[in-house]
């Protein structure tokens, strides 16, 4: 256990026995400079030992009789001539060496210690003669601190992460350890006679350099004496200009409520120290950060208390720092979308239903509606059937377009069918005409005619668009077209020629052999079902 922890325990034990005079008694003990071991012994000693220390300290402070005013006694304590017990030898301590000594002997022992240590004399004299900032500079708590004494705490590290890491010029340390382990610094803030910068430095400077053990002990003793001298007199609060309250730990846990956002012109030339000096008139400043920018136009100021931020915002804008116009805004952290909200959005998106006309790959949206794989297979099979029906319908429309091209007696070759042909908009009446050719000048065979409007008419004058080469016959083209359609699962028609007079040259009729072609039966899509389909014997 270190001296700070022991001091905290002793202070708590004294407060439990005498809460009104605990700060004064603790200040006297710190001025007497008992040492770490004796403070630890007092922290873990019996209750009677602590009670005897309280009684003796109250007698020394003059709190037992009311004849002496507290102001005169404080002058005796702080005065270099009458300061008592600045350097006590632990071996000669009446509290610890012999608990059975009389109070008269103890008083004589205290009266013998009138000589004050030179370091304490100089330091306590400087408390009255110099300002608080000069005192801190003498102790190594200066702002620039060339020797490396202490440092301003990093506000980013206090929030949880600092991007600069070990190369950061601010101190990465947990300030809570100092607040808990150093009651003298907490009590120091209660004194209204302390300037804001003095209180701020006592709160934030966490450690002293360890050049040598003797130097560390000297500096710790000076800090303890300064704290004790400032917290002995609670009446000094009436003379102070700044009256801080107790530390609000809830406000310390939420740094956003203790920060403000500054905006200023790019041509401003003030430094962070100037900003700290200006805003310290409103309350204690913990940190000032002006990030590096090409044209610096904003910064952040962190205060010790959130009430300081409220008072600054209530004053309004503008503020002037070194003749530069500064605007103050409340600091707001960037909003973060909670993971729970994002998860709910993803779940709702996955559970959104899809229609039957969706793609087969769009099963991700409706995955939550299927309990097993059979439902998924049934859905995919059903969609495949719909796609097959649509492909058959498209094939029928293409054949209708081929029919329209033949009816227009086009002298050129057959063009690629257009599914968006005008024949779909205004269809003509359909009829089935079957005629038998016997070639050349042979007689005409019998033919069947049907006038059903729901049946498909075969293409007319197919011979007019025949190519010159016999190897590119339309019959061969239609057979290949029918085979490719059969592979896709579709049923096709086979066109036959229309036997008009003077439509087919007689010279071409002898070059081909006649053959019979069985047309496949059409499904019930736009046509009436036939028994076997018409048989067309083409003889050209």
Swiss-Prot record:
It comes from the Eukaryota. InterPro entries: AtC3H46-like_PABC-like, AtC3H46-like_RRM, Nucleotide-bd_a/b_plait_sf, RBD_domain_sf, RRM_dom, Znf_CCCH, Znf_CCCH_sf. Keywords: DNA-binding, Hydrolase, Metal-binding, Nuclease, Phosphoprotein, RNA-binding, Zinc, Zinc-finger. GO terms for molecular function: DNA binding; mRNA binding; nuclease activity; zinc ion binding. The modification Phosphoserine is found at residue 451. The keyword GTP-binding does not apply. The keyword Disulfide bond does not apply. CDD domains: RRM_AtC3H46_like (cd12458). This is Zinc finger CCCH domain-containing protein 46. It comes from Arabidopsis thaliana.
